[in-house]
């Protein structure tokens, strides 16, 4: 039998052997060739109260990095920006798909809409919420150098299944602050002069929508998908009417927005 001294020697040898095999990583040659995971900011409404929104986003099957409350427009951070949250789902923008992995999700407490016998009623955002959102966008965009084209709504990246943040969302005000795009009214007016005379073919609308960032197939047909994508574009840039019809005003706005690269 081994005595105590021999047992101690064996234990020491095993310990030293383990140390000798320990993984050592040399960090003296860092690469400059990388960028941030975060390329997009996706904006949503919750279609729920604050309490319900917090419960859904922290214990449900969806999540976001930030939530802006109502009443006092408190900004809640629900997840570290290093992590992927589950807010975008099946999505695409400018050729990039499944944006959960490359975006920061911001939810805003807002009921969304309700349907009445006379039509759908949408809910506005409060001034406090808009100011809180602008401050948050400035903070995030500055740190990650987000391209204004990549600040989008859920309806932009998933137009077949989502309507948020809705037609009352203040996209123009965000764009004026540098967060997003908004077409110059004079440029739209000039472009419309041509389209008032003759509308372009459906394939042209599809091509311009793709240039603007929307996921759409060039079928040349006014199919269900094309109507949904047109409606998403209209809801973003012409919220007074978003019926998915390829009219002259839509063509003019689309031409200008698609050219804002």
Segments from the language model and where they lie:
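Bacterial N-terminal signal peptides that target proteins for export
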Residues: 1-8
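C-terminal motif of bacterial Sec signal peptides marking the signal peptidase cleavage site
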Residues: 17-18
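Active-site-adjacent loop/helix surface patches within enzyme catalytic domains
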Residues: 21-149
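Acidic, His- and aromatic-enriched active-site or binding-groove loops in soluble protein domains
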Residues: 33, 67, 167-190
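Extracytoplasmic/secreted proteins, especially bacterial periplasmic and envelope-associated proteins
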Residues: 61, 70, 128-139, 169, ...
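Second-shell loop/turn segments in exported
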Residues: 92-95, 117-128, 158-161, 191-198, ...
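Acidic/histidine-rich, metal-coordinating catalytic segments
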Residues: 146-161
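Short acidic, glycine/serine/threonine-rich helix-capping segments at coil-helix boundaries
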Residues: 195-257
């Amino acid at each position: 039998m081994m005595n105590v001294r021999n047992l101690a020697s064996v234990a020491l040898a095993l310990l030293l052997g383990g140390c000798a095999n320990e993984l050592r990583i040399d960090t003296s040659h860092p690469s400059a060739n990388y960028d941030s995971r975060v390329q997009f900011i996706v904006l949503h409404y919750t279609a729920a109260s604050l309490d319900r929104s917090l419960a859904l986003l922290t214990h449900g099957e969806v999540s976001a990095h930030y939530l802006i409350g109502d009443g006092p427009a408190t900004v809640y951070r629900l997840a570290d920006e290093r992590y992927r949250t589950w807010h975008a789902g099946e999505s695409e923008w400018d050729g990039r798909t499944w944006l959960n992995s490359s975006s920061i999700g911001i939810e805003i407490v807002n009921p969304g809409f309700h349907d009445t016998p006379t039509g759908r009623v949408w809910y506005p955002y409060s001034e406090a919420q808009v100011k809180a959102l602008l401050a948050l966008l400035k903070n995030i965009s500055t740190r990650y150098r987000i391209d204004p084209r990549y600040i989008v709504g859920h309806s932009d990246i998933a137009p077949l299944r989502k309507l948020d943040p809705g037609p009352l969302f203040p996209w123009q005000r965000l764009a004026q602050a540098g967060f997003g795009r908004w077409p110059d009214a004079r440029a739209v007016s000039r472009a419309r002069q041509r389209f008032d005379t003759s509308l372009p073919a459906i394939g042209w609308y599809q091509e311009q929508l793709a240039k603007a960032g929307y996921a759409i197939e060039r079928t040349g047909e006014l199919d269900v998908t094309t109507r949904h994508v047109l409606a998403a574009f209209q809801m973003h840039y012409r919220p007074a009417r978003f019926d998915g019809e390829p009219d002259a005003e839509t063509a003019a706005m689309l031409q200008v927005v698609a050219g804002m690269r």
